[in-house]
């Protein structure tokens, strides 16, 4: 490489300058940010993979120490969570995108689906109150894998009457079929691709505050793309113009 590479940075080793504060415990993550008189949210989640919500009784939780408010899906009829990546099927039709409310409405569709949120003066108070919420479920048959999902399984989202989000592929099916038909031997094997998830040091987190004087929100959250969060939250969740919502991404632990 020519001598100019070190000066331009192209082809040269780039020295990191941010490691010292992380190695010495001086990172600034979302959980490190605290605001005056802040409250805490704790989600009550479904233990079932597929079930109807019959009733939610939060009366005992409402009377619990430190509780500020309790919300369920009935309180969030507007402002769902949009899909950030749109895909079209091979025939050009858009993918099915059923509603994705912040809290389950009438039905849970996976273990851990959010059923209620408790707002309290401390995280311990919120957790304690959530344990007092009584949810009655009608458990439904779960859809556990893709093959079962197509074989007459119950619909996870009844309003779209299918368990297939989109039909998309690559390659030449006719050429593949011909190659298999002309082969001397054909071996078939079922391969299951396991679910993958990164084990980040920091889970999803957010802290937000509202300025009554300016009617503006500020959100601190774990994100590598705060501009997209501002766009989606403003347009689809909070129905706010972007200039009324400020999203700050501090250090991200994953």
Which positions does each model-derived feature cover?
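Flexible, low-hydrophobicity surface segments
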Residues: 1-162
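ATP-dependent carbohydrate kinase catalytic cores
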Residues: 36, 241-244
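Short, surface-exposed connector motifs at secondary-structure boundaries
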Residues: 40, 109-111, 209-218, 252-253
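Predominantly extracellular/luminal regions of secreted and cell-surface proteins
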Residues: 70, 170-179
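Acidic, glycine-rich active-site loops and adjacent beta-strand->loop/helix elements
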Residues: 76, 223-226, 251-253
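Conserved beta-alpha junction segments in alpha/beta enzyme cores
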Residues: 176-238
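Beta-strand segments within the central parallel beta-sheet cores of soluble alpha/beta enzyme folds
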Residues: 243-251
């Amino acid at each position: 490489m020519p001598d100019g590479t070190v000066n331009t940075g192209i082809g040269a080793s780039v020295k990191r300058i941010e490691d010292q504060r992380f190695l010495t415990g001086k990172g600034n993550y979302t959980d490190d940010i605290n605001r005056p008189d802040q409250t805490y949210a704790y989600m009550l989640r479904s233990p079932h993979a597929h079930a109807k919500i019959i009733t939610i009784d939060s009366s005992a939780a409402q009377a619990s120490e430190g509780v500020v408010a309790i919300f369920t899906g009935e309180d969030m009829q507007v402002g769902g969570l949009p899909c950030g990546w749109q895909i079209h099927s091979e025939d050009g039709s858009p993918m099915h995108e059923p509603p994705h409310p912040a809290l389950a409405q009438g039905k849970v569709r996976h273990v851990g689906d959010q059923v209620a949120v408790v707002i309290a003066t401390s995280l311990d108070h919120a957790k304690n109150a959530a344990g007092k919420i009584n949810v009655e479920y009608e458990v439904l048959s779960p859809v556990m894998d893709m093959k079962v999902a197509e074989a007459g399984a119950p619909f996870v989202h009844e309003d779209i009457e299918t368990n297939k989000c989109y039909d998309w592929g690559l390659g030449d099916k006719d050429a593949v079929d011909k190659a298999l038909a002309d082969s001397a031997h054909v071996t078939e094997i079922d391969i299951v691709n396991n679910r993958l998830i990164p084990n980040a040091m920091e889970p999803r987190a957010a802290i937000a505050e509202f300025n009554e004087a300016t009617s503006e929100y500020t959100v601190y959250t774990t994100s590598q793309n705060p501009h997209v969060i501002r766009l989606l939250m403003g347009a689809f969740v909070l129905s706010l113009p972007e200039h009324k919502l400020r999203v700050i991404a501090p250090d991200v632990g994953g």
